[in-house]
């Protein structure tokens, strides 16, 4: 007998009962701009735009206590695609602060008794932002034709160099221990199944975290995604069985690119892989692509201000039956980060997210700027850190980075109090890279390990490392002894981002602290986080990075920044299992333990196995200091215009919970 997940069903029954008969009674339960479009015949009535009365999503927890007001434009800074993307994200299931999931795009699910088959139920009558029906076909098509085409079915390896959009959380072990992708199949327009080879108790959490947009508009995509004999037929099944309905046309790469460009001049991509990555994974950036979000971009990415307009087919309503969102337009304004505070205080921006380094100026100007400073809670392992690529292509540097005495030496060379004062106005605290106190994974003493500055002890540790000199050359640097770099100064290049000015300042301070150790530090400045990530995907072409890893909200659910599963983790590099040419760690090495613990986590079929593997990963960091933490803080901040209502501060903010998206912007409204 199938086991219905009681929490989802109970919640659904309660909200349907409370909501029955109220949705369609009053035309004022939609934005005036939409009501005008209905009146002039350019938009269908509300009841034809949202799911059926039994299936519409009713937002009860975040409904405002005061009567909301429709309309207006909220202006905020453009912090890049990972700012405005999560801001309005709508996942299949939503992860909650306690690590459980709740219904969202999906209204519920069943799980078979053997734990292998998830049956997912969608909302009847739900539509994409262009008014076309949203069905299970869109989910099954996305999985089989957009996602797993990047995975070798026999090895589980990602087969394309830029395939960061595939996540290995759909992989489970078959009877021979081989990790294989799940099978996702169409049942009917509101139902599809996910079939695993072995149980994965956190599958829905994995979807909520790492493949939250497990859908795309098939009818819009089918002529712009390459489809040939090998595209999605790794399963050996027909188009009809995979997605229901008609089969898909054969599309060459040239045809896909031409068809995309014919849709819009904005879709001018150099190859099909880039097209799939941008329109399949980072789709929210592109005007014209249908979504399920409350607002959609209407601007070219090159515009200084990205204008996101309300989705007239948005499928959520508040407790009184008003269609969400309340705000008509969100504008994301690009400007120099140094101007954020000035523009906020002048009243030109409604919302600015900032860290501890800018707290004094924002706090002092609340009354002048007619705003309030609100707090977000961060579950960081570290807010400021640096790390070394354990797979760097040069063997002598790789051996140096792998030496734990080297990592401990550079850790205790850092004056953390000075970094705190110079970069963050003393608003943070010295800390090693470790789970914070108060979290389930906290280890007593771990945040204090190897953080007291001691230059003499650091030099003593370096003096004991074979292959590098104790003495300095004429310029004051230690050199390599033997090998290809014999007699050459040890020079370490740190990756930074131009759009994160504290990166460069931190590297300058590290250069100051490492100089007495005889280690030369230089900076490799990248234009932004995406450019830096391209080097991570390559795996072995960068040496070191600052402020790359913040840790993990929950290692069982999201180990990406602390384990060896991904192909873009800075310290693991090519030891990341997603790499098609992933390296095998040396037997008995610390990295071997991390990789094996990661494999155990990925193949775990019970919560006990998951917990054991997660504990091994945490202990690997405790014992090996893979990432060197400098400072930590459990807070970041928002300058919120007083005209923004229903903004609830104190929410947990992290990638897994989608940063500001966890404050449910669709429930905010503007009123003076």
Locations of regions flagged by a protein language model:
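Short, well-ordered beta-strand elements
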Residues: 68-80, 107, 117-120, 139, ...
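Periplasmic binding protein-like
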Residues: 131, 340-359, 366-372, 515-574, ...
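Ligand-site clamp/hinge motif
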Residues: 123, 279-286, 308, 313-364, ...
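Aromatic- and charge-enriched surface segment that lines or borders ligand/interaction sites
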Residues: 108-155, 187, 193-195, 203, ...
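N-terminal lobe/hinge region of extracytoplasmic solute-binding protein
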Residues: 36-39, 44-113
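Gly/Pro-rich hinge or "lid" segments in bacterial periplasmic/extracellular proteins
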Residues: 78-79, 83-97, 208-324, 329, ...
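Detector for C-terminal structural segments
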Residues: 216, 289, 295, 304-306, ...
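A structural "hinge/loop" feature
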Residues: 60-86, 105, 203-213, 387, ...
């Amino acid at each position: 007998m199938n086991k219905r997940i009681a929490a989802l069903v109970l919640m659904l029954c309660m909200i349907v009962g409370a909501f029955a008969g109220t949705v369609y009674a009053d035309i004022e339960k939609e934005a005036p701009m939409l009501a005008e479009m209905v009146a002039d015949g350019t938009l269908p009535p509300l009841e034809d735009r949202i799911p059926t009365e039994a299936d519409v999503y009713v937002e009860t927890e975040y409904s405002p206590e005061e009567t909301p007001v429709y309309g207006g434009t909220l202006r905020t800074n453009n912090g890049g695609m990972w700012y405005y993307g999560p801001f309005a994200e709508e996942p299949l299931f939503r992860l909650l602060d306690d690590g459980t999931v709740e219904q969202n795009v999906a209204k519920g699910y069943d799980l078979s008794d053997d734990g292998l088959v998830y049956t997912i139920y969608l909302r009847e009558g739900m539509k994409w932002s262009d008014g076309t029906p949203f069905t299970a076909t869109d989910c099954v098509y996305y999985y089989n034709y957009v996602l797993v085409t990047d995975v070798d079915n026999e090895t589980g390896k990602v087969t394309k160099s830029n395939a960061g959009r595939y996540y290995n959380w759909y992989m489970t072990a078959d009877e021979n221990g081989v990790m294989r992708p799940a099978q996702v199949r169409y049942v009917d327009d509101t139902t599809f199944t996910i079939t695993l080879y072995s149980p994965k108790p956190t599958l829905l959490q994995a979807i909520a975290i790492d493949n939250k947009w497990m859908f795309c508009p098939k009818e819009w995509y089918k002529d712009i995604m390459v489809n040939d004999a090998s595209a999605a037929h790794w399963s050996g099944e027909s188009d009809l069985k995979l997605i229901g309905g008609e089969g898909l046309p054969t599309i060459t790469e040239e045809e896909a690119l031409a068809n995309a460009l014919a849709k819009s001049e904005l879709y001018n991509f150099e190859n099909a892989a880039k097209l799939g990555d941008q329109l399949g994974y980072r789709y929210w950036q592109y005007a014209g692509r249908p979504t399920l979000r409350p607002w959609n971009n209407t601007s070219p990415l090159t515009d200084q201000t990205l204008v996101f307009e309300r989705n007239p087919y948005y499928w959520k309503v508040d407790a009184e039956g008003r269609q969400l969102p309340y705000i008509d337009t969100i504008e994301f304004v690009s400007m120099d980060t140094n101007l954020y505070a000035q523009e906020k205080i002048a009243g030109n921006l409604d919302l600015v997210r900032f860290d501890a380094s800018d707290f004094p100026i924002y706090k002092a100007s609340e009354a002048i700027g007619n705003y309030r400073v609100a707090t977000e809670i961060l579950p960081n392992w570290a807010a400021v850190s640096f790390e070394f690529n354990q797979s760097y292509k040069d063997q002598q540097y790789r051996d140096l980075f792998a030496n734990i005495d080297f990592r401990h030496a550079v850790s205790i060379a850092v004056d953390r109090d000075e970094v705190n004062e110079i970069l963050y106005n003393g608003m943070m605290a010295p800390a090693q890279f470790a789970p914070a106190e108060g979290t389930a994974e906290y280890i007593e003493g771990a945040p204090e390990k190897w953080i007291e500055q001691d230059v003499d002890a650091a030099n003593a540790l370096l003096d004991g490392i074979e292959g590098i000199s104790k003495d300095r050359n004429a310029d004051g640097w230690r050199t390599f002894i033997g090998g290809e770099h014999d007699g050459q100064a040890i020079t370490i290049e740190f990756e930074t981002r131009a759009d994160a000015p504290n990166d460069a300042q931190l590297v300058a301070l590290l250069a100051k602290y490492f100089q007495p150790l005889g280690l030369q530090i230089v900076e490799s400045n990248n234009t932004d986080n995406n450019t830096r990530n391209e080097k991570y995907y390559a795996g072995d072409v960068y040496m070191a990075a600052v402020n790359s890893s913040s840790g993990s909200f929950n290692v069982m659910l999201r180990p990406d920044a602390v384990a060896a599963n991904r192909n873009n983790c800075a310290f693991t590099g090519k030891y990341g299992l997603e790499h098609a040419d992933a390296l095998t760690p040396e037997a008995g090495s610390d990295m071997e333990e991390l990789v094996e613990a990661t494999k155990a986590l990925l193949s775990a079929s019970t919560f006990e196995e998951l917990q054991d593997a997660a504990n091994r990963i945490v202990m690997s960091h405790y014992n090996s200091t893979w990432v060197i933490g400098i400072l930590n803080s459990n807070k970041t901040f928002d300058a919120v215009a007083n005209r923004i209502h229903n903004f609830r501060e104190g929410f947990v903010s992290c990638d897994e919970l989608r940063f500001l998206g966890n404050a449910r912007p669709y429930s905010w409204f503007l009123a003076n």
